[in-house]
Amino acid sequence: DACFMGALEVGKEGNINAHRGPGAFAGIGGFANITAKTPTVVFCLSFNAKGLEVTQKKGVVTIEKEGSVPKFVNKVKSVSFSAKRAISNGQKVLYVTERCVFRLTPKGLKLIEVYPGIDIQKDILSQLLFEVEI
């Protein structure tokens, strides 16, 4: 079984904030229950927010304009999903963006896929606020 969930922020350890946005606080609902008990959790989110413009032609992704608000941060504002708990529970966790895919490991995030047209240094690594395993 798998679940597909959104996320506001991803922390360097793999923790997720899915309920506390800038200047607002929303209830978490069933998010914690679903993500804690599902063997495979896939978080789907844009790499950056606010102004991001992406095109895709013939399987090639192009970042036309970068977003100004990072979604991959050193520490999330609030923990909706615990990466440490997911690792101890043996869950498979993926973070899917418009440009790449990361997998949760005991060391943190590992970059496992980069889409055609994406420059790994310019479009991914230089946009991160922390280092990831490659």
Language model region names:
Residues 1-134:
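Conserved phosphate- and dinucleotide-binding cores of soluble alpha/beta proteins
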